[in-house]
């Protein structure tokens, strides 16, 4: 059963022991952000050397999917790892009380859905820094439920729950017995917001094939199936880093033909999401954080 809940190529777990993470939070309270970024810039080359699988996957992404030459691909891999490190540092910065600027495009879409009694689904992906959206896209009327990986350290989970709870948000952990599905369905039945990632296949999870960067890629069916079965609206949210303390959030509708068969609706939602994801990744290519061959899932 555990195999169904862990990606075969990429665990998605934040690196570092709990004491290291607690120390990082403490350092954020006394050190400027630019200094920690500088240390990260020096660490990145070593991480690239020892994380060969992740390096290769990102190099192939820039070279094969975006058409970069060899030198440009290499530099982009470094920029990608550095940007990923920055987003992790920013997350711990929030835990330590650091403030960031957020600009949101499409906030009115969320505001409008919150006026209606039914719940809705927010789809995220492993680009930019979606978790930090939980500290900016604050629901005004509805409770927000985020489905998250259960394998993080206690330090990460405690701080995540603490910060989110301040904004009428709660965490639903992925469970081996799949009980999280009941929690998600219950939240939608109660007219609440459900948020989950829609870009990674875990083990034997059912998937849907989509056209993505001029090739076929598999996306998990679960989020789209839930939205269709519950007949609720779907939004995609991408939160991209644009400066040292500045993020830009894109909130977009994910549409399908509600008169089509349920299977066709799921496929249309998945393709609509994949199209929007590709658009954002092309705008921010160094913020694509799936460190495995996405097209060979």
Residue ranges and their predicted role:
Residues 2, 50, 114-115, 139, ...:
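Non-catalytic C-terminal accessory region of glycerolipid acyltransferases
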Residues 2-124, 157, 161, 168:
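Membrane-anchoring hydrophobic helices of lipid-metabolizing enzymes
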Residues 21, 67, 135-138, 217:
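Hydrophobic alpha-helical transmembrane segments
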Residues 71-72, 76-79, 118-176, 190, ...:
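Catalytic core of membrane glycerolipid acyltransferases/transacylases, capturing the structured
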Residues 96-102, 170-175, 213-214, 259:
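Short, flexible loop segments at the rims of nucleotide/cofactor-binding pockets, characterized by
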Residues 102-103, 127, 153, 174-177, ...:
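A conditional alpha-helix N-cap/helix-loop micro-motif detector
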Residues 105, 147-149, 174, 252-254, ...:
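Conserved beta-strand termini and adjacent loop/short-helix elements that scaffold enzyme active sites
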Residues 110-111, 134, 160-161, 184-185, ...:
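Short amphipathic alpha-helical segments and helix-helix/interface helices
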């Amino acid at each position: 059963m555990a195999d169904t809940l862990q990606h075969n190529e990429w665990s998605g777990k934040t690196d570092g022991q709990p004491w290291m993470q607690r120390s990082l939070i403490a350092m954020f309270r006394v050190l400027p952000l630019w200094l920690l970024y500088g240390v990260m810039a020096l660490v990145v080359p070593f991480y690239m050397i020892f994380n060969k699988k992740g390096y290769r996957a990102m190099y192939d992404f820039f070279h094969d999917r975006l058409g970069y030459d060899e030198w440009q691909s290499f530099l982009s891999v470094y920029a990608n790892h550095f940007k990923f490190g920055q987003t992790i540092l920013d997350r711990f910065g929030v835990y330590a009380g650091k403030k960031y600027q957020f600009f949101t495009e499409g906030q009115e879409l969320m505001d409008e859905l919150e006026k209606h009694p039914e719940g809705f689904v927010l789809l995220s992906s492993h680009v930019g820094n979606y978790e930090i959206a939980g500290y900016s896209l604050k629901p005004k009327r509805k409770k927000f439920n985020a489905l998250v990986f259960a394998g993080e350290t206690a330090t990460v989970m405690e701080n995540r729950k603490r910060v989110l709870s301040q904004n009428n948000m709660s965490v639903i952990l992925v469970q081996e017995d799949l009980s999280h599905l009941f929690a998600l369905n219950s939240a939608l039945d109660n007219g609440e917001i459900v948020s989950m990632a829609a870009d990674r296949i875990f083990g034997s999870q059912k998937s849907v094939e989509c056209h993505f960067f001029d090739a076929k890629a598999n996306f998990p069916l679960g989020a789209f199936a839930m939205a269709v079965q519950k007949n609720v609206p779907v939004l995609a949210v991408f939160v991209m880093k644009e400066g040292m303390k500045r993020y830009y959030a894109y909130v977009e509708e994910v549409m399908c033909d509600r008169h089509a068969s349920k299977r066709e609706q799921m496929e249309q939602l998945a393709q609509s999401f994949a199209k929007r994801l590709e658009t954002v990744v092309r705008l921010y290519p160094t913020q694509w954080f799936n460190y495995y061959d996405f097209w060979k899932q």
